[in-house]
Amino acid sequence: MQKHFKHLFSAITIMMAIVPSAMAQTYPNRPIKLLVPLAAGSTADILSRTIGQELAAITGQAVVVENKAGAGGTIAMAELARATPDGYTIAFASQGTLVFNIALYAKPGYDPVKDFAPIMLVGGVSNVMI
């Protein structure tokens, strides 16, 4: 029993030494790029810049808002899909970029289910088909 306790105590001691080093990594430690798939001055651009300012204030890091308009938003979303999935490149997406483009384009350059993970919901819009 005493031998078993020594091994258990040793394992716990090693784990306690490892955990603080894993937790020491900080995020973010460099600027965050926020891609907007619409033109400058659009509602999405204004919202993303407002969110970017708040995110910068909370994290203490700069948030660079980059407009990548064109091709119904596929240019920005394809760039996001190619980016390293480390949280330093995020995008302002809509139902157009996440749903409609997948149905409209044969090869949009991204798969919204596999390539992206939601962070937050900014707002909602009701659509009506007439």
Segments from the language model and where they lie:
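Residues that line or immediately flank small-molecule/substrate-binding pockets and catalytic motifs
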Residues: 12, 95, 123
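Repetitive helical segments and hydrophobic/amphipathic motifs
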Residues: 15-16
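Hydrophobic/proline-rich hinge and linker segments of small-molecule sensing/allosteric domains
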Residues: 106, 123-130
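Short Pro/Gly-enriched coil loops immediately N-terminal to beta-strands
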Residues: 114, 119-126
